[in-house]
Amino acid sequence: MSNKAVANRYAVALFELAEEKGQTDVFERELELVQEVFETTPQLETVLAQPGLAADKKQALLRDAFQAHLSPAVMNTINLLMERGRYSEIVGLAGEYKQLNDDKKGIAEATVFSVKALSDSEKNQIAAVFAPKAGKRELRVVNVVDSALIGGLKVRVGDRVFDGSIQGQLKRLEKQLVAGQ
């Protein structure tokens, strides 16, 4: 089973429990904390990957680090991953859980490629225009500056791409010209 599938399976189980308890956002914040610790402390994963370190010591390390900050359900999920030797799925679990929670709320992330950095006002306008097109209530806009676009915007929401860039228009024109020969 792929890493993403494993992380998703645990995320779905935890999300269902969170929904029952009415704590989906609380669990998300807790998992974001765990993800942040793993991402800012690469040594942690190195230690957890050590085959010479006993599994119970690895669990104790994480328990000591997180127990005061996590609900029992989130801590138990992390412990379960550790027991099964799937420490590398902890960060993936956080991402998958966030995706589930966002889907439930009708929120998606939009990557907007532009020639120059966008202002907050421009990001808000783009979110307002593209959220309904993507079938979402709200979009979180992440701006990526790409000078190859020449001008205009390219917006990616999930697997959908809205290409209004000059580069995209030129490519479409080229295809039409080649097809018309």
Curated annotation (Swiss-Prot):
The keyword Ion transport applies. F(1)F(0) ATP synthase produces ATP from ADP in the presence of a proton or sodium gradient. F-type ATPases consist of two structural domains, F(1) containing the extramembraneous catalytic core and F(0) containing the membrane proton channel, linked together by a central stalk and a peripheral stalk. During catalysis, ATP synthesis in the catalytic domain of F(1) is coupled via a rotary mechanism of the central stalk subunits to proton translocation. This protein is part of the stalk that links CF(0) to CF(1). It either transmits conformational changes from CF(0) to CF(1) or is implicated in proton conduction. It is a peripheral membrane protein. F-type ATPases have 2 components, F(1) - the catalytic core - and F(0) - the membrane proton channel. F(1) has five subunits: alpha(3), beta(3), gamma(1), delta(1), epsilon(1). F(0) has three main subunits: a(1), b(2) and c(10-14). The alpha and beta chains form an alternating ring which encloses part of the gamma chain. F(1) is attached to F(0) by a central stalk formed by the gamma and epsilon chains, while a peripheral stalk is formed by the delta and b chains. InterPro entries: ATP_synth_OSCP/delta_N_sf (IPR026015), ATPase_OSCP/d_CS (IPR020781), ATPase_OSCP/dsu (IPR000711). It is found in: Cell membrane. One of its GO terms (cellular component) is proton-transporting ATP synthase complex. One of its GO terms (molecular function) is proton-transporting ATP synthase activity, rotational mechanism. It holds the Pfam family OSCP. Belongs to the ATPase delta chain family. It comes from the Bacteria. The keyword Membrane applies. Keywords: ATP synthesis, Cell membrane, CF(1), Hydrogen ion transport, Ion transport, Membrane, Transport. This is ATP synthase subunit delta. The gene is atpH.
